[in-house]
Every structure is written in C-alpha cells, then in structure tokens.
C-alpha cells in the first residue's frame, strides 16, 4: 500500500479527459493571442516613446511609468481593479457600454468571452515589461548605423526600421518572445484570481 510508480499515467489521464483537452486548448488559444499582441504592442509603444524622448523627455518618462505600472502591481491589486472595471452592473466598462446603447456582457462569467477578456488583461500586464526591454534594445542601436543606412538610400522611417532597427532588435526580440511565452503559459494565477 506504499506509493507506486505511475509513469506517464497522469499525462494519459489529462489528455484522455474532455476537461483536460479543453484546458490545453484554452491555454494554447490564450498564448496564441497574448504573445503576438503583447510583443507587437510593446514594440510599437517602445518605438513611439523612443521617438518622443528627444523632444518631450518629461512626457516620455511619465508615459514609461504609466505603461510599466501593471508590471509592478501585485496580482491581487490588479485582479481587484479588473473585477471592479468589469463588474456586470457597477463596472466602468459596462456603464460606458450601456451609455452607448451596447449590451453589457458578463466579461468574467460568459464562457464565450472570458478567454478573450483574460487575454486582454494578459496583454495589458505584459506590454509594459516588453516596452522596457525594447527601449533598452533601441538605446543600444548606434546612431551611426542610421547614418550609414541613409547614405545607402534608406531615407524614410519605414525603410530605416526594416533595414536597421528591426535587424538590430533581433536578440532583444528573441528574449522578449521567450519571456512573454513563459509568462503566458503561467496564466493560472490570473484565472484563479479573476474568475
């Protein structure tokens, strides 16, 4: 009656049950939404703030702090804030929706919406951290590379991005992708706290 070796029985049980397969599908869907959206938005915000840094440094620093705030917030504080915002009758989101004549859905209770609601919250949590990492990568790009690209004919912002910025952000982007993927797969705490 001692402990026995189960081998891969737990995995067989997980993949064999409908509940287990559903959990895996939902996690993969969540990850497929959160990773590209949070990496893309983090890059866009970093590019915007990097471009503003020279002309509006105080505003840029304030915006950096605002975007990074969700990273520094505790899970409980974040969960309470989102529960208040998404409350079915008292929440700010549904109040605005009702004022516009839209239906007020149950964001955290409706089976068809909760996964996407959690994905939006996951993106919100991650964008600030990704922004900081991309800002560090942008700061490491030598200005002389942009000068050389301009001499070679890359005069527009888009060509400068594709020929200099994006290739030089390769290592940073890889790191951001790995960290974002690891965080996206650790979604249990958010789900357990909010739903």
What are these language model-derived features?
Residues 1-195:
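A structural signal for multi-pass alpha-helical bundles of membrane permease subunits
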